[in-house]
C-alpha cells in the first residue's frame, strides 16, 4: 500500500479535501478504520492529539472520524461506522473539525515559543510535551525559579505580540548539519524544521499557526519540580482567555466572601488565617481545660467513657490519654462525626487492641493502633458505642 499524502504539512489551514480509500477494515465494534491516499487529518504524534472531523461517502453517508494514526507511512482514520460503501477506490470528502484543529495549533506553536525562550534563557531542554484536554504539559531538563518563569512568560508573549511568521522548511542533510535546532530524538529521513524568528528552531511534524499573533496569549498556570527539572502546565489562545476569566471569577467570588476588593483578596485571606489561628489556639486551650476537668472527675481504677461533641481526631486522642493518666480502667473518648462515631480507646499498662477489633466487627468500624491506645470510627451513634464498651470492657 502506498503512503498517504499529508496535506496538513503543506497547509495547516486546509480544512477540506477529496481523498480516495486505499483500504478499510472493521474494528469489531461497529466502527472501522480507513486508509486514504491523501488527508487533511493530522495523526496523533509528537505530543499533539489526532484531528477530528468527518468523511462523507458518495451516497451522502457521513462517517465521524474519532482518531487518526500513522502506520508505516499510511494514515488510518478511525470511524464510528464502516458501511459497505466505504470500499477501496471510493472517493470521500474530508472535513476537519476546525475549532479542534486550531486549538491544537495555538497550543503547539505556543509551546514551541516558550520552549525556545526557556532554552535561550536557561539552557533548558524540553524533555516532555503533551497537549491535554485542559492544558499543555511541558517538562524541562533543568530547574527554573518562579521569577525566571515569569520573565520567560513575558518574553514568550512578546514574540506573540510581534506576530512574526512561523516558517516551515525541509533542509538538505548538508543544510541540516550546519543548523542549530532543538530535537528530542534522532530523526531518520527528511527532517521538518519549524522556525520562529527570535524564539525557536525545532524539528517538528505538528501543525502550527502561520504567524505567532494567532497564538493569542501564552499563560503558565502551574509549575512543579519534576525529575530534576520543572513540569509546567500552560495554556494558549482561547484556553488562556478562558483561564483568565475563570481566575478572575474565582477572585471575585473570594472577594465577595471576604468583603474585599479583588485587588485586596490576598490581604483579606491573611487576615482570616490569622483570626483562624488565634481561634485554634484558644480552642486548644479550652479543650485542655475541659479534658483536665473530666480526668479530675475520674476515680482511680474506674472505667472512663466520655462523649464530647465536636472533637477532631487529635482532640479524641488527647482526651483518651488524659483520662488514662487518671485511671487504670478502660478509657474511651467518643464524638459524633459524619461516619457515625469517632473513638479513641486507651488503657494505662493495658492492651485495647482486642476490644477495638471487637468494636469494629460489631459496629462496622475501622481503626487500630498500639496496645495502649487505638483510634478509629464506626457506623453507630456514640451512645451505641458507649453501651458496647460497657458490656465488653473486659476484652
Model regions: which residues?
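A glycine- and charged-residue-rich anion-binding loop/surface
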Residues: 1-395
